[in-house]
Amino acid sequence: MQFVHLHWIDFTIIAVYMVGCFVIGLYTTKYIDNAGDFFLAGKALPFWAIGFSIVVSDIGATDFVGVAGNAYTYGISAANFDWLGSMPAMVFAAFIFVPYFWRSGVFTIPEFLGRRYNAGVQLINAGIWIMVMLISLVMMLWTTADDLVRTVLGYDPMVTVWAMALITGFYTFSGGLSAVVMTDVVQLVVMYVGGLSLLALSLWEVGGWGSLREGVAAMGDQFANHFTILLPNDHSAFPWSGIVFGLGVVMAVAYMSGNQAIVHRTLGARTEWDAKAGMLLGGFLKSFIPLMVALPGLCALIYLPNVIKADPSVVPAEMVEHIETAAGVMPMLKEQDKVVPTMMRLMLPPGLQGLMFAGLFAALMSSISGTLSSASTIFVTDIFNRSKVLLGGKPLNERQALNWGRGFTAF
């Protein structure tokens, strides 16, 4: 595997981004006086910040790698995880669940279930969410760091893991949900700039949308469905029935309406209108994500074979397999997850590589901070405080809840 060699300009861009997140977290600390400020941003979040935060917190760095790889192998249907798998469910959540949750004044979804049913339901649901969030946090950190740092850059991922964990942990510890959302706004901009840069250069290199479609069509029947949104029901990876009903109707609605990490932002909205509008804005912004993460994978079908044919040394021979197509024998990557790293190495100039890596780190750090904030809110509200009351103790006051929330985040 050949590694991406970052220029000093790239390191400067990444460093400025990291320092910026640190400064924002430090700045928001002065607005945190009680538990409501820490856990729900004082219920003062505007709709645009909520929308930005929902999108970037739901997109991980592995989405850029995984979805592009699936698009390379299966086609544009891989984009349905953000189209049919998010947008309709977010509209549904905005008008049905979000107003109801916001008016109830709860801090968490488990707290709402506790009011609706009983303390047992609240504790069980909270316990499940804590375990899921902590496991996903560890997996997110290690998997992404290993994929991006060891595989792409060739560095020891532990340094990156600790750097991102400390910076993200600091601003989440200091500013709570306010810091999470405000850094998310910056992170979404960084992520979009990096992702759209890769998309623009990818389309430029293959001659535009028309040339891309013609080039893929010329490769023959095995690539005939690469521009089909819904694949046949007998497709092994993305059958239309599974995408429409399993993903779009069942999983997406449950995820967008019942996931604390998603709904958390809307609970901190300054008005019910902001809560609904934030979710709707998030759905609109999410419609652009597949353009950044799936289309570069499609472009790679044309770009990489041409580059490898011109100079076989640009990609190690062990990464390449030769496939017979209607357009002739084409050198293709054996592993679909190597598509984006290879495109970044071969296509992006210094500066844009730094922006792209900053965008990938932004996607990861937003997911981490959102998970930390939501997990600490659930732990203090639904597990510690609820158990304390059930055992005959007094509920936590505002200062105690704030201290326990920060303590759990640090832990």
Regions found by a protein language model. Give the residues of each.
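Loop-to-transmembrane helix boundary motifs in multi-pass membrane proteins
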Residues: R116-L123, L134, V380-F411
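Juxtamembrane interface elements at the cytosolic ends of transmembrane helices
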Residues: V19-A35, I96-P110, F170, S174-G176, ...
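Membrane-interface "cap" regions at the ends of multi-pass membrane proteins
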Residues: M1-F64, T172-G175
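Loop-to-helix junctions at membrane interfaces in multi-pass transport proteins
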Residues: Q2-H7, L40-L45, A49, G66-F81, ...
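Short amphipathic alpha-helical coupling elements at transmembrane boundaries
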Residues: D37-L40, E111-N118, A126, D147, ...
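Helix-loop-helix module between adjacent transmembrane segments
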Residues: C21, V56, S77-G175, L247-Y255, ...
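Membrane-embedded translocation segments of transport machinery
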Residues: L333-M365, R386-G405
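Residue-level recognition of pore/gate-forming positions within transmembrane alpha-helices
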Residues: M18-C21, S57-D58, S86-M90, I130, ...
